[in-house]
């Protein structure tokens, strides 16, 4: 009887350790899955930003062809696009682990969006430009890009929120802390003034 009791203690310890290990493993896997969802959505955000950037050379070339078009507007777009391009690819790729890089990238993209909005607003003063087929095609493509950007940013924020909520709950927060920067909190896109709704870029007036 005494010998049987002597086994109870070690067995109980083994069971407890096994349960803890299983819980830690399950929590780790859950954080990994949620983190991968954030990474995937971050890639989507970059893709739609790139799609917008690819439209800019043709847009600038088109408006430059309009007589007496205000050069400061398309020069501002070109400058803003260049600022985005100056951000090192590694900084963009690793921005989810560096809030400063994330904020810098988001700000540069917002400034590019603002410059485009100003250019398009000025374009309304040039009916002949707006009547061209190339400009109307760019209008449709740009509107689609802005809609996709707003949509993918929202999806990214949703994925980041799901990760952060899981990470910050107890005892998950303790487990996340065991792995250092592996499970850092994910940054969010912040709404900019006037960004509550997607701009309606429409030149067919």
Task: Annotate each predicted stretch with a short phrase.
Residues 1-205:
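A helix-centric hydrophobic-segment signal that preferentially recognizes long
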């Amino acid at each position: 009887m005494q010998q049987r009791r002597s086994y109870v203690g070690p067995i109980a310890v083994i069971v407890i350790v096994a349960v803890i290990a299983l819980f830690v493993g399950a929590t780790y896997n859950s954080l990994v899955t949620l983190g991968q969802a954030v990474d995937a959505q971050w890639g989507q955000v970059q893709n739609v930003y790139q799609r917008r950037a690819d439209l800019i050379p043709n847009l600038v070339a088109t408006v430059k062809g309009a007589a007496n078009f205000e050069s400061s507007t398309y020069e501002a777009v070109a400058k803003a696009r260049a600022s985005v391009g100056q951000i090192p690819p590694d900084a963009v790729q690793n921005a989810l682990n560096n809030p400063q890089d994330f904020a810098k990238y988001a700000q540069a993209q917002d400034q590019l969006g603002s410059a485009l909005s100003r250019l398009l607003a000025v374009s309304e003063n040039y009916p002949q430009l707006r009547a061209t087929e190339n400009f109307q095609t760019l209008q449709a493509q740009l509107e689609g890009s802005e809609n996709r950007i707003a949509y993918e940013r929202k999806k990214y924020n949703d994925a980041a929120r799901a990760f952060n909520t899981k990470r910050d709950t107890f005892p998950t927060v303790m487990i996340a802390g065991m792995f250092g920067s592996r499970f850092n909190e994910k940054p969010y896109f912040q709404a900019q003034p006037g960004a509550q709704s997607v701009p309606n870029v429409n030149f067919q007036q």
